[in-house]
A protein has these predicted regions:
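Conserved anion/nucleotide-ligand pocket segment
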Residues: 8, 127, 131-152
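N-terminal Rossmann NAD(P)H-binding glycine-rich loop of SDR-like oxidoreductase domains
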Residues: 10, 14-18
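Short acidic low-complexity segments
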Residues: 54-68
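Rossmann-fold NAD(P)-binding glycine/threonine-rich loop
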Residues: 79, 85-91, 98-121, 130-138
């Protein structure tokens, strides 16, 4: 089982991830983290996500380094992600990032860190955006260099 921490666990994507992890036979939710002060802190992450209780309470900080964790999935804020990547680097944890609005210097830092720890980063994981990108890719293969494809 791959042990996953979801950062931004009470948000829309975080809740969807927790639901998906619950349905997976190869993934296990090990930690659900969100912003300090949210009313969901201390609540069961399964219940917050609209599924049955899973016993993983939403916390406002990553578990201690001694806790067994295989990967971090971050759908937080740009500021939080900038801090989270440093924690993942320190702990040598792979991270998947779906946070939007990262500053250029943070993206540069991600590129450097990716030589040390595995990083998957996309600004947008929505189905609509990814379907559009796939359609543009297909159109460019069909039309080749004869047309200029632009998304407005």
């Amino acid at each position: 089982m791959i042990k996953v921490a979801v950062l931004g666990s009470a948000g829309r994507m975080g809740r969807a991830l927790i639901k998906g992890i619950a349905q997976s036979s190869s993934l296990a939710l090990s930690a659900a983290i969100d912003k300090p002060g949210l009313k969901s802190i201390g609540e069961d992450s399964g219940l917050v996500s609209g599924i049955e209780a899973n016993g993983i309470l939403i916390s406002d900080s990553l578990p201690s380094p001694s806790e067994d964790l295989d990967v971090v999935i971050d759908f937080t804020s740009a500021q939080a992600t900038a801090r989270n990547i440093e924690v993942c680097l320190e702990r040598k944890l792979p991270i998947v990032i779906g946070t939007t609005g990262l500053r250029p210097e943070v993206e540069e830092r991600l590129e450097k860190i990716s030589n040390i720890i595995p990083i998957v980063y996309s600004r947008n994981y929505s189905l609509g955006v990814n379907a559009t990108m796939k359609l543009v890719e297909l159109a460019s293969q069909i039309f080749g260099e004869s047309v200029d494809i632009e998304i407005v």
